[in-house]
């Protein structure tokens, strides 16, 4: 995330992309992204795409076979669009760096690409391309994604905790609170979603609203009973 803030001081760019050294870009990766973003005008816009799995020097199947959900209710819980596929226009970069860098505990858990996706949804648009223009390497050192998870990671997931031990419910609530603080002028529909997460521990009104929201419960990917008990 600090790289975005550092590079953004330059003014001679129209688009910015993440680049992971592990992955293999196919020839049309940036062309495809810019083609989707070029008509965004003054709208803060993010592009993300599917990936082709790549292991032991062999191309596999697409990572995702179905269209991904790019709604706020989904992304406040989990981000499935990898940063290595993301390209953002200058307007989105400005929307990100015009606010403070998000707290470390949020970035450590959600990772920078999840924050970028959330800001894009709140302030502009998130374009998902079901096609793949990148080979996604699968190996033991992948930070997130397809690799086999450790026993510790599986236990943390079972206990609904991030890898730093903090409860996922707290992290989602903290993320929502920071987004509300940083972006107070968002649409009321988005504000209502974030307020449920940000205030449900302090307000019965928001707690009931969160527990009754079937779309949010589905988006968590968690057992509904476990979600309601948190």
Residues covered by each model-derived region:
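C-terminal subregions of glycosyltransferases and related glycan-biosynthesis enzymes
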Residues: 99-105, 109, 137-230
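Nucleotide-sugar donor-binding/catalytic module of glycosyltransferases
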Residues: 1-150, 162, 229
């Amino acid at each position: 995330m600090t790289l975005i803030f550092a590079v953004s001081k330059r003014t001679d760019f129209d688009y910015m992309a993440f680049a992971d050294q592990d992955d293999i870009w196919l020839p049309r990766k940036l062309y495809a992204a810019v083609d989707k973003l070029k008509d965004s005008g003054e709208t803060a816009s993010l592009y993300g795409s599917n990936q082709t799995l790549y292991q032991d020097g062999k191309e596999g199947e697409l990572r995702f076979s179905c269209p991904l959900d790019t709604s706020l209710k989904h992304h406040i819980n989990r981000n499935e669009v990898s940063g290595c596929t993301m390209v953002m226009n200058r307007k989105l970069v400005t929307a990100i760096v015009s606010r403070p860098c998000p707290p470390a505990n949020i970035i450590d858990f959600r990772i920078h690409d999840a924050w970028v996706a959330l800001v894009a949804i709140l302030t502009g648009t998130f374009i998902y391309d079901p096609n793949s223009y990148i080979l996604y390497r699968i190996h033991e050192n992948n930070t997130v994604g397809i690799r086999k998870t450790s026993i510790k990671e599986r236990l943390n997931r079972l206990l609904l905790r991030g890898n730093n031990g903090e409860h996922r419910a707290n992290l989602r609530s903290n993320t929502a609170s920071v987004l509300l603080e940083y972006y107070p002028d968002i649409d009321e529909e988005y504000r209502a979603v974030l307020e449920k997460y940000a205030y449900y521990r302090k307000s019965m009104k928001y707690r009931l609203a969160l527990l009754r929201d079937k779309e949010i419960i589905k988006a968590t990917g968690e057992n509904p009973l476990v979600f309601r008990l948190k």
